[in-house]
Amino acid sequence: MKASLFSPLKMMHGAALGTAVSVAVSMLVASVAVAPADAVAAPAKSTKSAKAAASAKGKKRTVAAEKKAAHVAAAEAPHRSRRHVTLAAGPGRHHGAVRRVAFQPRQQSVGQAFGLHDTSDALALRSSVAYVVDQATSEPLFDKNSHAVVPIASISKLMTAMVVLDSKAPLEEQIEVTDEDRDYEKGTGSRLSVGSVLSREDMLHIALMASENRAAAALSRYYPGGRPAFIAAMNAKAKSLGMTDTHFENSTGLTSLNVSSARDLVKMIDAAYQYPLIRRFSTDRTYTVFTGKRSLVYNSTNALVRNPSWDIGLQKTGFINEAGECLVMQTTIHGKPIVMVLLDSFGKYSRTADASRVRNWLDAGGGERLTAANTGAGGT
């Protein structure tokens, strides 16, 4: 079974997933060819014939230049899809320089590297890991690579929220974002600038709803005992929930070392669902905060919460290259509480499309235990 390739953490250190994206920059400066003036005019020719001769020569040069340009364009055509071209012209300059930057394809996710995407399933999901459970009975309804241990990105923030609320720290306490809360591993940005001050409650709100990374980082730093104590509490909470495939290295999920399995995540979702604030904050559509400098309007990272046809009780999205597109949800379908875990999906909208495929399947009468193994795949 492919899942046997994975074990918490050991798999993570062996995979060649830290491939740096190399960027090759070259400067292309256009040169302008100027025809030399004739030193001596032919006296036997009239002015009119001289002009005609010059015109003919000019046409020959133009045709030759066009042929050369076409040849160069044809040679460069296969590489154009790999280059981003920017024209840079500074103030007072008379020429511009064309900068061509070659990009390598996005690095593989862990699931791609270990062949999890080779597992087919009856619903043709883009997610390499999928697990759907009847929340009331804990009965698995759909299973695809549910034992595989993979990075979970910002799904980690559900555990972050539980640890924050378990600490009983005052929700009204003001928390300031500092340089320590920047993302130095992935280099991601944030609208929450250094020096911003929000209440613990607001930080938790935007961390869950909008996956605001600096908010999650600041929450861990303000924990009693600091960030190391917070991470220890996350792992202790996971252990107490019986999450044996799970390990956390930070509160944001911006590391490939935050790993879990779909089966473990069902346990985490069930636990998080018991917190009313987590349910409310994670399913809000929009929320405005005042940072002490300005007001910021945040929107949910999950478009499905804005879709009235969905009844979502809890949700969280996640993405880093190593994890792919991730989505976990508690939702009600035909009066039945359902937990969905979709990990390592490829494509910007693929995770929500997969959720819709699962719901349509359940709407059509699906619901008996269906695994990738009994639909012709190589096992889960």
Where are the predicted features?
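Hydrophobic alpha-helical segments and their boundary regions
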Residues: 11, 15, 19-20, 123, ...
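Active-site-adjacent loops and short helices of periplasmic peptidoglycan-processing enzymes
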Residues: 89-94, 98-263, 267-276, 333
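Domain-terminus/edge residues, biased toward the C-terminal soluble/receptor-binding domains
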Residues: 243-247, 253-380
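N-terminal secretory targeting signals
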Residues: 2-126, 364-380
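Secondary-structure junction/capping motif
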Residues: 62, 187, 199, 226, ...
